[in-house]
Amino acid sequence: MNAALKRRQARLKRQVRVRRKLRGTPEMPRLCVFRSAKHIYAQIIEDVTGKTLVSASTVNSDVVEGLENTGNVEAAKAVGKAIAQKALGMDIKNVVFDRNGFLYHGRVKTLAEAAREAGLSF
């Protein structure tokens, strides 16, 4: 088994372990983050109905404006601000942060800090 496959399997184990305990309610939906090599995605999900309330990513053209690269820390900061602004527009202030098995470091940490600075609390 190569190193990349081991890392992916370890992330999926962390994801399952955390998802058992973490649920988004109508009062406090779940802010879920996914990161790939080229993009970063964030969505706010209410787990009771299984619906995505708000989403933002570096694939969206409104977030990418003025960015040279979509897979770096600056892009994660832009996505964090965008998701917070959209959430506050829907009167969502409190969320539960789901790092989706990724380590709280780098782009995931930057997205979370940018969302907090823009007004979300978790």
From Swiss-Prot:
Single GO term (MF): structural constituent of ribosome
A biological process from GO: translation
Cited SUPFAM superfamilies: Translational machinery components
Classification via CDD domains: Ribosomal_L18_L5e (cd00432)
InterPro entries reported for this sequence: Ribosomal_uL18_bac-type, Ribosomal_uL18_bac/euk
A GO CC annotation given for this chain: cytosolic large ribosomal subunit
Keyword Transport: no
Swiss-Prot/TrEMBL keywords: Ribonucleoprotein, Ribosomal protein, RNA-binding, rRNA-binding
Domain of life of the native organism: Bacteria
Family matches, as Pfam families: Ribosomal_L18p
Subunit structure: Part of the 50S ribosomal subunit; part of the 5S rRNA/L5/L18/L25 subcomplex. Contacts the 5S and 23S rRNAs.
Family: Belongs to the universal ribosomal protein uL18 family.
General function of this protein: This is one of the proteins that bind and probably mediate the attachment of the 5S RNA into the large ribosomal subunit, where it forms part of the central protuberance.
Protein name per the record: Large ribosomal subunit protein uL18
